[in-house]
């Protein structure tokens, strides 16, 4: 499940992503041919550890223990004129549209710093102050509408600057300086 605009609860957008969209760190991303250009932007992934519905924000810290950096891939210049890149699942949930790093424990106290580089060149830096509070609020907001189950992934999207992807490139992303995601683009 991808959550956009979590810092503005009134404008929060939620969309579900297919399991086949996930590419694990170390695996290659085969850049699709159905759009002219593809780009990636940083996100933070949280793995849900227990079943819950209508979770109050003050209890949401009990529902996750691990986080990782991820990248949300999107395309532009669609070959199919009827594809709306903002709402169509073909544009948002295609195979390979979510690049996932390796999960690491999160103490719930520290701020998070996420970085994205392509071919060693820094492309995006996202500093998240009060990360625990924002994650807890996102879990609370989403659980009002969806039952969260063990193993579900909640992706908080940076909606920041996008980095252009190109075949032959290497994408790396780190969380708090620890490289967590490495993907070769083919």
Predicted regions and their residues:
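Extended, compositionally biased flexible segments
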Residues: 1-71, 75-82, 183-184
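Catalytic-pocket segment enriched in acidic/His residues
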Residues: 12-13, 74-186
């Amino acid at each position: 499940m991808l959550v956009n605009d979590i810092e503005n609860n009134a404008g929060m957008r939620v969309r579900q992503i297919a399991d086949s969209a996930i590419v694990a760190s170390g695996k290659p991303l085969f850049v699709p041919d159905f759009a002219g250009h593809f780009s990636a932007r940083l996100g933070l992934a949280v793995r849900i550890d227990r079943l819950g519905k209508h979770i109050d924000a003050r209890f949401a810290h009990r529902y996750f223990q691990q986080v990782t950096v991820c990248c949300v891939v999107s395309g532009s210049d669609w070959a199919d004129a009827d594809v709306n890149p903002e709402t169509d699942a073909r544009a948002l949930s295609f195979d390979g549209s979510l690049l996932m790093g390796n999960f690491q424990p999160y103490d719930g106290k520290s701020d998070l710093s996420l970085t994205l580089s392509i071919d060693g060149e820094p492309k995006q830096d996202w500093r998240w102050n009060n990360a625990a509070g924002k994650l807890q609020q996102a879990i609370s907001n989403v659980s009002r509408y969806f039952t969260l189950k063990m193993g579900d992934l909640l992706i908080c999207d940076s909606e920041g600057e996008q980095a252009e992807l190109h075949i032959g490139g290497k994408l790396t992303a780190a969380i708090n300086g620890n490289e967590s995601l490495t993907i070769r683009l083919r």
